[in-house]
């Protein structure tokens, strides 16, 4: 039988036979495989043989193939000479495998055997190089097998650990970058980095392509119809991707993939700085803690961020976009987390209770703020006058007394205020609206605080006490006037 021409650049390439692409086991090793793996082995071997026959290479049918075709347990499988000792595989997580696992991993190897001599004459035939990339002849031989077995070259087998097999040597190197987390290809437009050039090229279309797909709900435009479809799930709340382990549903497949690691405990990416382990995207973000890198910059105000998601959220300050809408009351929010907190308002649920006084709160942050009443803690200090405050909002309002800033303006009369709540109260003066009514006498008031003060007429409550003589008063102003009796102060002068 004539020899088949070898790939370009080869020297005295030998015949490609079934043994060159076969995987052989001993009987004991075969019995270590489960039923599904044995079936997989049968399918791959039969398909490899059929491909050789179609190329006119295999003449006689090996006993192994006859046995497999009859669905019998191969009695003659052996492992005296294991062909393809150096396949192109990802070995990032293959360390410390048990012997049984090692046997099973043999199923996951694409077979590569030496088909001739290397350029160096002192090397023996059938002695393999350490890797495919070391020897151009082997590399060529591998590509030749790659062409002959086009139907089977892309088969990928996985165990619980990552031992992925590739049809091309270059694909192996590209895959390894997923484990290292290294992203060598950077977009000049927005600074986003990618581990593969093809991903960068795909991403750059975002900057050049016209955004012709518009969301009818919020008006946002997209380059691809698929991106619009995914975006719509924000409004519809659709979650088509469900975890089989716990039943939790997700809007995006990527979110489901990340979630699954909670159950498996998989954290394949390690921080070289501290040795902590993460998922790939989390590792990239975590590394920026050490480097201080902030590659995502807002074109509107120049503020920089370490995460693209934080930049996306920030941009809504400028656009006013509020894509997260409450189905209960119609109120919209810029962040999904804010909507989640808001929903508790409707349920009335108060999970956080103060151990000091028993008062319950909807949010943990509100409870923490409340606790400062008992502890007296005032962590916010004014650099201008030294006055301290327990709340950041109160501190912000106070600073405006020094700057004179009054950002909240009444459209009706032009009067400006330093607090939004003060403006809100002021507006009621123009409407004449009196929403707060006394159940006791029917009298109505503009402000709730005024109603509370009025109620003391009916209840007789006197919350203001003089420290000097223990006399009590209904109103703060009455206590202030009373104190003048003790001090002898006469603030009002007759002219």
UniProtKB/Swiss-Prot annotation:
It is found in: Nucleus. A zinc finger (C2H2-type) spans 157-179, 185-207, 213-235, 241-263, 269-290, 296-318, 324-346, 352-374, 380-402, 408-430, 436-458, 464-486. The keyword Transcription applies. Keywords: DNA-binding, Metal-binding, Nucleus, Repeat, Transcription, Transcription regulation, Zinc, Zinc-finger. The keyword Transcription applies. It holds the Pfam family zf-C2H2. May be involved in transcriptional regulation. GO terms for biological process: regulation of DNA-templated transcription. It comes from the Eukaryota. Residues 16-87 form the KRAB domain. This is Zinc finger protein 716.
